[in-house]
Amino acid sequence: MSTGAQSKAVVAGQHADGPRLLADVGGTNARFALETGPGEITQIRVYPGADYPTITDAIRKYLKDVKISRVNHAAIAIANPVDGDQVTMTNHDWSFSIEATRRALGFDTLLVVNDFTALAMALPGLTDAQRVQVGGGARRQNSVIGLLGPGTGLGVSGLIPADDRWIALGSEGGHASFAPQDEREDLVLQYARKKFPHVSFERVCAGPGMEIIYRALAARDKKRVAATVDTVEIVERAHAGDALALETVECFCGILGAFAGSVALTLGALGGVYIGGGVALKLGELFTRSSFRARFEAKGRFTHYLENIPTYLITAEYPAFLGVSAILAEQLSNRSGGASSAVFERIRQMRDALTPAERRVADLALNHPRSIINDPIVDIARKADVSQPTVIRFCRSLGCQGLSDFKLKLATGLTGTIPMSHSQVHLGDTATDFGAKVLDNTVSAILQLREHLNFEHVENAIEILNGARRIEFYGLGNSNIVAQDAHYKFFRFGIPTIAYGDLYMQAASAALLGKGDVIVAVSKSGRAPELLRVLDVAMQAGAKVIAITSSNTPLAKRATVALETDHIEMRESQLSMISRILHLLMIDILAVGVAIRRASTNGELPEAVAQAKARASDDETADVLDWLSHGASPAAKDVARD
């Protein structure tokens, strides 16, 4: 069964790839809508979650009801933490794999995000008609925004401005421990402790928490309460003037106000704090006349700070759709034209230069990338209405070795269900959780590096190293580990090498370098002034510098060649973990490249290098390649055959 409700905004054009499915899945109901164009949300329907065994069944029922046979892109806001592929709902019995659900429904993209993360993304677009201010002054533009809301659970999120966009915070703040502020709330806590080993704000401040408060106050007054009383009935009684229900609502709103004030202080939410969820909205004037605002401001020395922060009650009917639509649009924009997916950008840039037949393959890749990834070449050719050789020519036009190589690169560009973002490790994570996050973050950074690494710069660096008279590796602090590793690899090539992790030794040695010498400088920040001065001295004497660092740093700008390794771990206060792995990988790439060059180069080399190369036979150089674990020497192959 579903309740039909439709909402349609002003038409702003149609999505070229067809309507997008939007969903807002709560503990009780699942709401679905179609977005046929930017801002055009229609066919909103609500389905009780208990009526459907799985989320896939609910989605199929909706698509059948609205007579839509094909959806390419979908996004779901769900009342649950989302961390990885498997989602198991806390307040409902649905459990599903995001990727398996995407495949089962035939979507190209399926995003699943926390519902309050989605709601947070809707806040900047709310109009005055979609919110009611409850106290406070004027919100500060381009400042942090707080969000919380009681529904089946207590959602908490925030919105942080970053240049011309917003970043939503994923949070489970509703599970913070409840802290009573008066004797009445002490009674509520004591009552709740009899039922729950840990009493969080969600236990007393979400929808079901109103029943806890009601029963606690009834026990205080020695009143008998029906076994079936629920939040809806309590709110109805309060509107009818029932004294116990009114006190329950007042206590509930006071606790919510105190919690909202804590959220505002924690986030520094000068852009305002918004209250979403269904409970506060149903309270109506009972909420606006309650002690919510007074308790929001009651923070002792910081009362004046909070007096100026406005609080808003969200009145928009389906605000989560606006937020999840914005998140999906940003992901698809990144895929087709953003910096996070180089392969899609390359297709767009080269499209006009392709033949008409190759353009059809390009359009298939842009609009239906999953089809390219999953289908065999015969099906790809059929869908694009081209020959199979045309598919191969298209892949090679993009610089790929063939279809398999193109599929791999295309898959890494799909951010819809492949984890390409940084997952935070939290206190209390199990070894399984934090171990998976550390590995996923590292893998994500490596895939990003592969997509964005300038291989022309890599070739130039290998050329410089292969012709070097002497190579010195400089790294300070944690980067010295990378420098030492590089020294151990490169000394096997017969080139004089050394690694220095001390500034005084670097300065003394750099003063002796000249033409034909190379320094490989490894630095996460690329800003150490002492290191930069040392490199300036060496470069003025004719030495070349290869920098392994972050983009747009002073080191990257000074170096002869810069190999840039950007990633999420960018704060100076952080110990280099991911950056160390990326820097070590860059050394591996350079070492393998030099090993291959020295095994195959027949051109002229500097005299000292030529003599060293003469002392190392091709077999010995191949042994070095095998030693680097990226090749197999003839001897190793013989052993394998034996």
Curated annotation (Swiss-Prot):
Q: DNA-binding among the record's keywords?
A: yes
User: What Gene Ontology terms for biological process does this UniProt record contain?
Assistant: glycolytic process
Reaction equations catalysed: D-glucose + ATP = D-glucose 6-phosphate + ADP + H(+)
Enzyme Commission identifier(s): 2.7.1.2
Name the positions where ATP binds.
23-28
According to the record, the residues making up region (Glucokinase) are 1-340
Keyword check for Transit peptide, yes or no: no
Q: Where is the SIS domain?
A: 461-600
Q: Which InterPro entries does this one have?
A: ATPase_NBD, Bacterial_glucokinase, Glucokinase, Homeodomain-like_sf, HTH_RpiR, RpiR-like_SIS, SIS_dom, SIS_dom_sf
Gene3D superfamilies, per the entry: 3.30.420.40, 3.40.367.20, Glucose-6-phosphate isomerase like protein, domain 1, Winged helix-like DNA-binding domain superfamily/Winged helix DNA-binding domain
Report TM segments. 576-596
- Which segment of the chain is annotated as a signal peptide? none
Q: Which domain of life is it from?
A: Bacteria
In which residue ranges does the UniProt entry place its DNA-binding region annotation? 377-396
Q: Which GO terms describe its molecular function?
A: ATP binding; D-glucose binding; DNA binding; DNA-binding transcription factor activity; glucokinase activity
Write out the annotated subcellular location.
Membrane
Instruction: Spell out the residue ranges making up region: Putative HTH-type transcriptional regulator.
Output: 341-642
Q: What class of enzyme is it?
A: transferase
Q: Which PANTHER family match?
A: GLUCOKINASE (PTHR47690:SF1)
Membership in a protein family: In the N-terminal section; belongs to the bacterial glucokinase family.
Name recorded for this polypeptide = Bifunctional protein glk
**Species of origin:** Burkholderia orbicola (strain AU 1054)
